[in-house]
Amino acid sequence: MPRNYENAAPTQFQRLPEYHRDEAWIRAFLHRAEIGHLGHARAGQPYVTPTNFWFDEENRQIIFHSNIAGRMRDNLEHNPQVCLEVSETGRFLPANTALEFSVQYRSVMVFGKVTLLKADEEQRRALYGLLRKYFPNLEPGVEYRPISDQELARTSV
């Protein structure tokens, strides 16, 4: 008989215990993962938006950015509850019967509430963290122009 998850916490583990990962594995996975899928909703309509992100481990925050205006920003202002799913595909597993074919994958789901960063220095720190994740060998002011006040005014972090 299927389980009833209606009253279960979203973080309640649902897989076999041998597939459970500890905090260190989860943190390392969030640091190396390239793309996350941000689940958000508005007026009962769910949306999933692929996004790059930075796991700010020191502050236990997931940092991402979007346009200053748009559907995602509007949705998040009305309903800040989100879920970020991050995954990577493993091996494809053939079988002798169709229903036994499978795929291995690793994933993490993070549940939380979006908070828009307001202070310019907070935004800069977050954006530079995001840039360091994807372009670790490039330095602001050397390989690219530092983030300007005008650019900060055009983005949401």
Where do the protein language model's features map onto the residues?
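Glycine- and acidic-residue-rich phosphate-binding/metal-coordinating active-site segment common to enzymes
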Residues: 80-81, 85-88
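Charged, gly/pro-rich active-site loop segments
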Residues: 1-17, 91-157
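Short, basic/aromatic recognition patches
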Residues: 8-37
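A generic structural micro-feature
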Residues: 45, 76, 102-106
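A generic structural signal for nonpolar/aromatic side chains embedded in well-ordered alpha-helices
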Residues: 30, 75-76, 130
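Solvent-exposed residues in well-ordered beta-strands and their adjoining turns
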Residues: 67, 87, 115-117
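Short beta-strand segments
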Residues: 33-68, 84, 100
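Histidine-centered metal-chelating micro-motifs
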Residues: 69-74, 83, 92
